[in-house]
Amino acid sequence: MAAKMAFADKPNHFINFPLAQFSGFMGKYLKLQSQLVEMGLDCKLQKAPHVSITMLDIKADQYKQVEFAIQEILDDLAAYEGYIVFDKPHMLGRCLVLDVKGFEELHVDIVEILRKMGCTADQSREWIPHCTVAQFEEEKEINAMQFYYKLPFYLKHNNILTDSRLELVKIGSSKIDGFYCSELSVWCGERLCYKPPTPKFSDIFGYCCIEKIRGDLEIGDLPQDDEEAWAELSYHYQRNTYFFRYVHDNSIYFRIVCRMKGCMC
């Protein structure tokens, strides 16, 4: 009998796509909120505009799996390149929200990766991508409000690196300057800024380097067998995948060899 799929129906975290860094979007978003104020409506304005990509029920010791899942998505981000469209202001329960289109494939894939890594992701109810504008004390009818914005979602757009980020946020976290305080935040342009300095791992690293790299990382990050560790590092180095970036961030020795382009043993 197949195992029953677990859902995050009592979530404690979510994957967040923040929007406060996009000035074009924010100009229209704040104008929409000002209309609510001018109409004299009693509501709580959203101070950290965002799109929730998926909900999670996880523990703090699973943060690394979440980070690796996000990094794995970034390795294939070209598959999701296009535009995110915000339009059709309407009520969803007690909230005034914008419809959001363009994150559908990203949602499906990140949920799949998170589940493979042992994280409880997504909810049993249908995921409805939206961006909250304001919350009311009770359900209301809001008519005749207009909004449309088309946001480029690319690693690089017109020779400018993206401002997009994917973040892990604990539910109930505080908000500062339009952003949630996050447990981790990964810049979507990170992959373009991390490039292995040589075509092959063996061009600058030797087997003698493995133990020094392993010593900089957490227990279990690399296989204990040196040949297996070498094969894993070589694979990710030559493909510039998420584990290369993780080791580069966390191993001082690894960074020195990459910078010097030569083994330091």
UniProtKB/Swiss-Prot annotation:
Note the InterPro entries from the entry: Coronavirus_NS2A, NS2A-like
> What is a single Pfam family found in this protein's UniProt entry?
Corona_NS2A
Q: Which family does it belong to?
A: Belongs to the coronaviruses ns2a protein family.
Task: Report the source organism.
Answer: Rat coronavirus (strain 681)
Protein name (database record): Non-structural protein 2a
State the signal peptide span.
none
